Amino acid sequence: MKEKLLTLLFALIAYGSFGQDISLYQQFNGRYDFTFMGNTLNPSENNITPTCTINTSSSANLNLAPGNNIIAAYLYWAGSGTGDFDILLNGQPVTQQRNFPLSALNTDGQTRAYFSAFADVTAQVQATGNGAYTVSELDLTAWISDPLYCGIKTNFGGWAIIVFYENASLPLNQLNLYDGLEYVPTAINITLPSLNVIDNVGAK
């Protein structure tokens, strides 16, 4: 059995922080694989103009091959500030079911808040299938325009949907989904439990 892992780690450079450790959220065993899609809300590279701006929506496409049956789909979103936890996915309301707050002491000596959030959108993605997915009403404008974030290039927002699927033609796999929100100092150690890679062929 091959081992594949997926780690959702929104990383920020900082001196110290209070966040959420990376941990195992879910494991799938069988003829499974995964893909993901997502997009940023940033209209351009961070801090290239005196005033930072951000979009409140963006889109991405799902393109699964025929025969791949969706078994789970999870939406993650993240950004600067304390968070916006009620958003829309293709016009349908989505409310966070888990969230990962982070208070980071950045390199300029200022403490800033960042966040990530999670929602299970399996039913919606199964019903929609391939096509365009738009996350909207994710409004981080108040934080992005604040010089506290814009001044050190930590103004950001974005989202991703992780899609797990089954196909009888796939080899037996073990898929581990790890998530959390941590800062990245000059060095960091992250321990991933329940990970036993016996063959790196096809691992990812």
Give, region by region, the residue ranges found by the protein language model.
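Bacterial Sec-dependent N-terminal signal peptides
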Residues: 1-21
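Disulfide-rich extracellular domains of secreted proteins
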Residues: 19-204
